[in-house]
Amino acid sequence: MTQSFKTPTQTPLLGLSLAKLTEWVQQQGQPAYRGKQLYQWIYQKGAKSLADITVFSKQWREEISNFPIGRSVIHHRSVAPDATVKYLLKLSDGNIIETVGIPTYKRLTVCVSSQVGCPMACDFCATGKGGFSRNLEAHEIIDQVLTVQEDFERRVSHIVFMGMGEPLLNTKNVLAAVRSLNQDLGIGQRLITISTSGIRDRIRQLAQHKLQVTLAVSLHASNQRLREHLIPSAKFYPLADLISECREYVKITKRRISFEYILLASFNDLPDHARELAKNMRGFQCHVNLIPYNPISEVDYQRPTQEMIKTFANALAEQNIAVSIRYSRGLEANAACGQLRASRV
């Protein structure tokens, strides 16, 4: 079925493939080669509007100037001492989302949002405290990556869907964005991580696409009781069922799963918790990523001591579970894991 482009508000051009952009320019009465030019200006030269594309005639630029590419505006930008940058991006409808650029010597990672706000309301996370507005469209996800790439003036190498929102409650647009980021920006699927708190049947559905992305499951607890306290939706999705679905995912995709585990002092950080967690991890390809808690003002959780963090990690390692400790970047800019919310810092 041929996609129609009759009105300026119908389809932002960002996210469309070369073939679709070629179709679009032909529908506007232009030769097919203009499609490649448009593609290059959108994905490689960072055009914010069609009026920016100087290889097009002035007359045609004026005729198509109201058709949206689909770019956001940087509403606010804050930089942490470790060079991590947090962006508040203003969307076309006025909503604000957060994106984080995390540079190292060899990498530039972008932490992207998949929703405006988050409906999951995890007890330790700032994003859920602000409520939920809507899903992001695919072009609004792609735009976040382009924004960071242009601001840093270097190529993005890795993408993590660990910003605002639950990606598997917006699977259609997240997968469309992943395909475009892979095909149009040249970012390998294995360098893209999709994080989820665990939505019944969605991990199984994701497995059917047989993507080479990394799946990160936010577990955060070693048993059902603790998990229900941290993640309200866990009441409707028993831990045993979630682990079973994760095992099925690994079997189908042949890809290792990463389990994210936020360490909260005197709540889920004891060696007994580690041993209980290990029982769930045996028998399939997985890795546990420990995240020392990053404080937010709304709750009273505390970060464990360095000694407790290492003790927990060692307890997992003794059970032959692959484990690492992730010390979040951007803490001073409120850009670390669990701190994202659409507000200035």
Swiss-Prot record:
**How, per the record, is the cofactor bound?**
Binds 1 [4Fe-4S] cluster. The cluster is coordinated with 3 cysteines and an exchangeable S-adenosyl-L-methionine.
What would be the name of the gene that encodes this protein? rlmN
Q: Which InterPro entries match?
A: Aldolase_TIM, Methyltransferase_A, RlmN_N, RNA_MTrfase_RlmN, rRNA_lsu_MTrfase_RlmN/Cfr, rSAM
- The UniProt record lists the keyword Iron: yes
A Gene Ontology molecular function term for this protein is: tRNA binding
Q: Where is the active site?
A: 98, 337
Where, subcellularly, is it found? Cytoplasm
Q: What does the protein in this record do?
A: Specifically methylates position 2 of adenine 2503 in 23S rRNA and position 2 of adenine 37 in tRNAs.
Question: Other comments?
Answer: Reaction proceeds by a ping-pong mechanism involving intermediate methylation of a conserved cysteine residue.
Query: Where is it mainly found?
Result: cytoplasm
What Pfam families would the database entry show? Answer: Radical_SAM, RlmN_N
What's this protein's name?
Probable dual-specificity RNA methyltransferase RlmN
Q: What is its EC number?
A: 2.1.1.192
Q: Which cofactor does it need?
A: [4Fe-4S] cluster
